[in-house]
Amino acid sequence: MNVLLCSINTLKGLYDISGVEVGQHLYWKIGGFQVHAQVLITSWVVIAILLGSSIIAVRNPQTIPTDGQNFFEYVLEFIRDVSRTQIGEEYGPWVPFIGTMFLFIFVSNWSGALLPWKIIQLPHGELAAPTNDINTTVALALLTSVAYFYAGLTKKGLGYFGKYIQPTPILLPINILEDFTKPLSLSFRLFGNILADELVVVVLVSLVPLVVPIPVMFLGLFTSGIQALIFATLAAAYIGESMEGHH
């Protein structure tokens, strides 16, 4: 009886811990679901920036590209090169997915450094870059997982699952575990880097508010771009691996 009571108390303690939140959050009720309003607001802003800039740049395409059209053509060519390198000759259908991931993460990361989110007052909590929230990075990582499972099943059918027993069935648990660790590593890498960058800038601004934080902010912009590239490259690599076989 004592063992059973102890187990129940332990489970209750774990349940209580799972409900602990860091900081304050603003929630909306949509239907029967409770959603994180701060992430939705900042994500909508990022999506609006991407859609607005692309529409303005290419609404009247020219034979001789203008500055905006030329920039977006360069970005598209860059994303195509990344996709082709990681996926191979069948990269074409995956360019929109990889491009969407790269651009959303890139603009989200930069918005944390360039947009004055803090001046917008909310009833609870405060606004920040979408990728500063673990919910966003986990969602992006899960989308990537769905994408590479879909790519593998589309290319190989049920034979795709044969990779789990290659090169030997003994590795079955490890190969299964690998598919679970991929989204974890993607999400926590992106979340940790963006959160750490913003925290460093906030601390330096509070200590030395004039000159010192500026180089750190420029470094943060650089690392934010690198993180977007790493995420997109790994997503393309996982898709290419699922289509070609186990490496």
Swiss-Prot record:
It is a multi-pass membrane protein. Keywords: ATP synthesis, CF(0), Chloroplast, Hydrogen ion transport, Ion transport, Membrane, Plastid, Thylakoid, Transmembrane, Transmembrane helix, Transport. One of its GO terms (cellular component) is proton-transporting ATP synthase complex. It is found in: Plastid, Chloroplast thylakoid membrane. The chain crosses the membrane at residues 38-58, 95-115, 134-154, 199-219, 220-240. It comes from the Eukaryota. One of its GO terms (molecular function) is proton-transporting ATP synthase activity, rotational mechanism. The keyword Transport applies. The keyword Metal-binding does not apply. Belongs to the ATPase A chain family. Key component of the proton channel; it plays a direct role in the translocation of protons across the membrane. F-type ATPases have 2 components, CF(1) - the catalytic core - and CF(0) - the membrane proton channel. CF(1) has five subunits: alpha(3), beta(3), gamma(1), delta(1), epsilon(1). CF(0) has four main subunits: a, b, b' and c. This is ATP synthase subunit a, chloroplastic. It comes from Morus indica (Mulberry). The gene is atpI.
